[in-house]
Amino acid sequence: YTQYMYNTMVINPAYAGSRGVMSIFGLHRTQWVGLDGAPTTNAISINTPIENSNLGVGLSFVNEKVGPTVENTISADISYTIQTSETYKLSFGVKGTANLFNLDVTKLNPVSTGDPLLQNLDNNFSPNVGAGVYLHSNKLYLGASVPNFFETKRYDDNSIAVYKERMNMYFIGGYVFDLSSN
């Protein structure tokens, strides 16, 4: 997922509720326009702090299409924020994810029909969990997260070719500069 800068909660559950107000986000991205099977990403998320508590919650949905594959992911996030100083807050978050991966073999042109490598590849469901930490103020933010702790095999155990989604660590940071006093 390359659009994390626009929707940090997708990769870091500690971001949920960190803005202090309800936030709704939507994104559509199409690459290689006009090319059949070109990558397309759609994402929508909502997150909010829970009033009179240190908790934040979020829900996100991501749909990605690449060639003959479609992947739908829905995630629920919860975060807990601690005021560490007058300026900084530190948030911890956990994420629960449900993922549905589908390969449409009718969009492929195999050399021979009945290839065993192309069997049992549709509607592969996989759950996952993740966690993150997010330090933020009005000017500075730093974060670290692992959105998916479990390695996910995309094809059945009998296949020779297996695609695995491995655990990734994400680090994010930034500072807001004032360009002028006006």
Describe each region flagged by the PLM.
Residues 1-182:
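Subset of outer-membrane beta-barrel
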